[in-house]
Curated annotation (Swiss-Prot):
It is found in: Cytoplasm. Binds 1 Mg(2+) ion per subunit. One of its GO terms (molecular function) is magnesium ion binding. PROSITE patterns: ADENYLOSUCCIN_SYN_1, ADENYLOSUCCIN_SYN_2. Mg(2+) binds at D12, G39. Its cofactor is Mg(2+). Belongs to the adenylosuccinate synthetase family. PANTHER family: ADENYLOSUCCINATE SYNTHETASE. Its EC number is 6.3.4.4. It comes from Paracoccidioides brasiliensis (strain Pb18). CDD domains: AdSS. It holds the Pfam family Adenylsucc_synt. This is Adenylosuccinate synthetase.
Length: 421
């Protein structure tokens, strides 16, 4: 049976930790979409692991891992990340990771183009990670991209990459990019990549009877190309639909859809953020939560939990259970606000607006809850939480239409987790 872990907000919710927990009993862990723009941090045995394109299931020694068809793979980053994991003690990691031959190749060229496209946007920048994800997906949609399987074929990458570079040069003029160097490196990758590349259809068929398949979502619903705060989104489908499509999953095999919700809100980069706190509250959340992007190192924008957004996310992803993360970051607040509705021009909005400029204008309606002013870090049992912390969790459950909060994160370590059964 399949369990899917999805971000319910703007990303950085802490998906890696619940994935790590669930992967201990999983036989297969998969990434369905996105690329090395994603960032997951896991602390295990006092060692911090940073994941970008690789699935977090690599930490568990019995878990096989797949980078699926819906992803874009920057090959140098794939090997760099794999080497970093092995250097930290995951010696057999390279024996348990595979890539779909239908995944797209993200070139250094795409990163150069990403920067040029952002520069053209000037004051209306999307705020991308600069990793080339958008241009890579654009080339995929335009049917001129390169698939991972084609890297193994002699001469294919070189001819396609030269054509891509020529096209971008016609568009942007001279590029600060070494075409010959990238061509040379992919000659080497042709052999080096071969042990990792699989036919995903055959691979998934082989694992069709696997008792436990875990899908690790990247980014989050509000960054989805269709359902997110467009155009301030990533270039892939980050929700339930993207997971099914990117891994050719049988929908009837899905047992659990885990929505990961941070106990407050954060966002990296540009785009609307109705509950953002550009004040002492935001600074306190940023400082206490150490809110810096794993991929970019950028300071995350911080604000109160937004239940309008979370309900919208739930309506699209159909969560069966919630993992609430970083509850301990709210320990020192006298009172905690939660957004429960939006108004525009004095009228209550019935749904989450599609237009980014409308989201910038909404008036947020909050409910104020009392804080608990006591330490919850490291708590592992529900009864160990202060009464007001329990009430905060129960309030969120009600606002989510009764979707149960099964796991509550209370710190960075693997065992800093409450499981409510």
């Amino acid at each position: 049976m399949v369990t899917i872990v999805l971000g319910a907000q703007f990303g950085d919710e802490g998906k890696g930790k619940i994935t790590d927990l669930l992967s201990q009993s999983a036989t297969l862990c998969c990434r369905a979409a996105g690329g090395h723009n994603a960032g997951h941090t896991i602390v295990h045995d006092d060692i911090t692991y940073d994941f970008h394109i690789l699935p977090s299931g690599l930490i568990s020694p019995d878990c096989i891992n797949l980078v699926g068809t819906g992803t874009v793979v920057h090959v140098p980053s794939f090997f760099k990340e794999l080497d970093a994991l092995k250097a930290k003690g995951l010696k057999d990691a390279d024996k348990r990771i595979f890539i779909s031959d239908r995944a797209q190749v993200c070139f250094d060229l795409h990163s150069v183009v990403d920067g040029l496209e952002e520069a053209i946007l000037a004051g209306k920048k999307v705020g991308t990670t600069g990793k080339g994800i958008g241009p890579c997906y654009s080339d995929k949609a335009s049917r001129r991209g390169v698939r991972i399987g084609e890297v193994l074929e002699k001469g294919v990458v070189e001819s396609k990459l030269r054509a891509l570079e020529a096209g971008y040069r016609r568009q942007f003029g001279e590029l600060k990019y070494d075409l010959e160097d990238e061509v040379k490196r992919f000659h080497e990758y042709r052999t080096k990549l071969q042990p990792y590349v699989v036919d995903q259809m055959a691979f998934m068929h082989k694992h069709r009877s696997s008792p436990s398949v875990l899908v690790e979502g990247a980014n989050a619903l509000l960054l989805d190309i269709d359902h997110g705060t467009y155009p301030y989104v990533t270039s892939s489908c980050t929700g339930l639909g993207g997971a099914i499509q990117g891994l050719t999953l049988n929908p009837t095999s899905i047992k659990s859809i885990v929505g990961v919700v941070k106990a407050y809100s954060t966002r990296v980069g540009s785009g609307p953020f109705p509950t953002e706190q550009n004040n002492a509250v935001g600074e306190k959340l940023q400082r206490a939560g150490r809110e810096f992007g794993v991929t970019t190192g950028r300071r995350r924008r911080c604000g109160w939990l937004d239940m309008v957004m979370c309900r919208y996310s739930n309506a699209i992803n159909h969560y069966t259970v919630i993992n609430l993360t970083k509850l301990d970051i709210l320990d020192d607040f006298d009172e905690i606000k939660v957004a429960v509705a939006y108004q525009l021009d004095g009228k209550l909005l019935e749904s989450f607006p599609a237009q980014a400029d409308v989201l910038d204008k909404v008036e947020v309606k909050y409910v104020t809850l009392p804080g608990w002013k006591s330490n919850t870090m490291g708590a592992t049992k529900w009864e160990h939480l202060p009464t007001n912390a329990q009430r905060y969790v129960e309030f969120i459950e009600r606002e989510m239409g009764g979707v149960p909060i099964r796991w509550i994160g209370t710190g960075p370590a693997r065992n800093h987790m409450i499981e409510r059964i």
